[in-house]
């Protein structure tokens, strides 16, 4: 049976999911008991995974696509009936201002989860990584953490991510700024591991290309007034400004443009590359550019989008307008399920020992693109090499993906990001 647990009122839109997914799984189980087969029945492992994704806080716009990806992965894994019976326990990571994680992480751990998917924010993940990996001995895997801090973090081999380090995104961003002909750049930076890490790596790349970073004022989570930071940047008369922010972007960007800065000189990153059609006046950021790890949204499988949207909206969610980190969230759950299947165990340490193998880093495996295909390989005694909806993954010894891409986007007249064609 497929089970979906939910936390509090924040997950009211998903209240029907347990019934919907359980019903589908029950039908599949009933069919399986009556179907004649020549292969031996696969005894299922009961795997419980928690999520700590941003339902609230300054990254709440990432919550819907990430949760939709997780829910779709659960549906596909349970529908395969190939040895994993997956239960989800949904939670809210919040942010470092509302600190939802302080109650949610203990709740998830008390549920006996083998792994927690989240957080999206690097700064938030750093608030509970020790609690999850070192103290509880549970796997933590993020679909969106990009801070370089995690590469060398002492996590007992239990931390993984399906999004690349900002060493890569910073390089792409810095090179984009230079390629666009900018000689001087300013950055407004959220003061956490994500913001400072991306600032540092973008600066390295931009300065290596001959540019100069002239101002990098920071702000703290919870701040609402950015006048001093804006004045500091504009005083340096930069060619371009990079906004390394989350939901605060909705305040920062209009203030910059009202102060006379050109929208064509604005740059966004994964923390704020979103649909602003309902937030900004039409055309406000037309021509602005941004970077986002993962496949360009217009290259994500139509089947993936249709099924994720159908699952999300059927349970009360609004139509998805962003696919940021949806595929990485899906792939994180599939990798956990494959690792459990390969290990023959839902023990966190035993699963962690199989993550590099099932993601293709150790080599020698057979390529597969779905949980069902990979499970067939594993159940047949082989080694699976999963390439998911986000592309190749290949998690190395540090838990970092080694096969990934960074997309470049440009905002249209409706303030929606579109794949940049050059």
Protein language model annotation of sequence segments:
Residues 18-23:
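C-terminal motif of bacterial Sec signal peptides marking the signal peptidase cleavage site
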